[in-house]
A protein has these predicted regions:
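Exported/periplasmic ABC-transporter solute-binding proteins
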Residues: 2-27, 31-172
């Protein structure tokens, strides 16, 4: 199970997975979050370019959510206005924590991460059409020592029971 389609693509290119077992198991949404003091002050993405608001994003080179956020801001035509306001973080958890603590006004995380907000709130959910699909692929590794058990586990991950659990944690 990978949080990165690109990483799974690399495994497939290197012929390290059983290609017939590969599938996109989960999906996620990208959301704009705000710290509690922003409630009532910001209610849409356009305000990011006009207001004096800092934005926490994951590093573009290493954090998929950061890359997706840039795609959204490019698609909405606001990247040039918001780029100078961005404070980059090492991962999505760091983005969530710095916004939830009130150190930075807004940030972009996955909807599954936003469920962990204690003080902050979700300002907006970005359209899936504004960024590459956020999918979590799964596949059996070719040199798996216990393929039968691994296949049963993959089957379980696709079951209704597992899907309901994933939904509780913000995945689709």
């Amino acid at each position: 199970l990978s949080a990165s389609k690109k990483n799974m693509d690399n495994l497939e290119e290197k012929d390290l997975i059983e290609k017939t077992t590969r599938k996109d198991l989960l999906k996620n949404k990208l959301v704009l979050i705000g710290e509690k003091e922003m409630k009532g002050k910001i209610d849409n993405v356009d305000q990011l370019k006009t207001e004096n608001i800092k934005i926490a994003l994951g590093e573009l080179s290493t954090v998929p959510a950061g890359k997706y956020a840039k795609q959204v801001f490019d698609k909405l035509g606001i990247w040039n206005e918001v780029e100078k306001k961005i404070i980059y973080q090492k991962d999505v958890t760091a983005v969530l924590n710095i916004v939830d603590s009130g150190e930075i006004e807004t940030g972009v995380v996955y909807s599954s991460d936003a469920l962990e907000l204690k003080n902050g709130f979700v300002i907006a959910v970005f359209s899936d059409e504004d960024h590459d699909p956020i999918v979590y692929p799964v596949a059996l590794i070719k040199d798996s020592k216990n393929k039968e058990t691994a296949l049963k586990f993959l089957e379980y991950l696709s079951s209704e029971k597992a899907k309901n659990i994933f939904k509780e944690y913000g995945f689709e």
